[in-house]
């Protein structure tokens, strides 16, 4: 009697996959590779107009303002040890300035902030962390009724790099708390434009930058109160 070698089957159901005749059926198995990256973001835009009559005894002036902002996040979490958080944030606001005869509009909000934080889990809720943050502004800002520049793109700019620990508390995707403690923090202030006075930004006269070593504490809270209503706050304190 000739014995036939069995064919190599791809995948078999071991439990509950047999037919009524007792034969095992062949089945392909689709394995999904986990995606540890999460991309999210939100934005807003607000427009307001304020009219004050000439007869109003307290005085004042009518204004038109526009405020906008956005936050983009690119985060990595392997659900075991490693976390990487990257964030891009900007705020832009403009307001009309009737009393300013030189400039028709002025900036009321102007911020660009880039941040990154790498964490390796130490114990429950605590991570060894290396963090970096850079912030500056987009547009030039001037004194009222003057062409004297107060601030501009990269003037000033601030860079923070720190090493420390990060405490994280997350509850049911409703509350997200992070407290970053950097005992070792490096800060660099710089002014790129020759038209901006560096002494207004903690930089010595005649210089373009200033380096400082110190510590830094930063706490961020995101709390979803109800659907479509979220509370976000941020606290930062740096020593030198």
What are these regions (language model features)?
Residues 34, 75-79, 119-125, 170-174, ...:
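Outer-membrane beta-barrel channels and translocator barrels
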Residues 54-60, 96-104, 146-152, 200-207, ...:
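Extracellular loop and loop/strand-boundary signature of outer-membrane beta-barrel proteins
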Residues 62-68, 106-112, 155-161, 209-215:
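Residues that define the transmembrane beta-barrel architecture of outer-membrane proteins
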């Amino acid at each position: 009697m000739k014995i036939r070698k069995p064919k190599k089957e791809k995948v078999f159901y071991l439990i509950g996959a047999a037919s009524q005749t007792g034969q095992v059926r062949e089945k392909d198995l689709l394995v999904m590779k986990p995606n540890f990256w999460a991309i999210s973001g939100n934005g807003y835009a607000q427009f307001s107009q304020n009219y004050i009559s000439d007869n109003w005894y307290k005085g004042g002036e009518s204004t038109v303002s526009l405020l906008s902002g956005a936050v983009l996040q690119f985060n990595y979490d392997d659900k075991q040890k490693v976390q990487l958080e990257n964030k891009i944030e900007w705020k832009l606001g403009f307001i009309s300035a009737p009393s300013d005869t030189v400039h028709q509009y002025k900036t009321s909000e102007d911020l660009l902030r880039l941040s990154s934080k790498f964490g390796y889990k130490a114990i429950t809720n605590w991570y060894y962390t290396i963090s970096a943050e850079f912030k500056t502004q987009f547009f030039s800002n001037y004194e009222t009724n003057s062409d004297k520049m107060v601030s501009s793109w990269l003037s000033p700019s601030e860079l923070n790099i720190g090493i420390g620990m990060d405490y994280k508390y997350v509850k049911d995707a409703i509350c997200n708390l992070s407290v970053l403690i950097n005992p070792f923090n490096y800060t660099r202030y710089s002014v790129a434009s020759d038209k901006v006075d560096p002494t207004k930004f903690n930089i010595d006269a005649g210089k373009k930058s200033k380096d400082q070593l110190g510590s830094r504490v930063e706490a961020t809270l995101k709390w979803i109160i109800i659907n479509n209503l979220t509370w976000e706050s941020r606290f930062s304190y740096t020593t030198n």
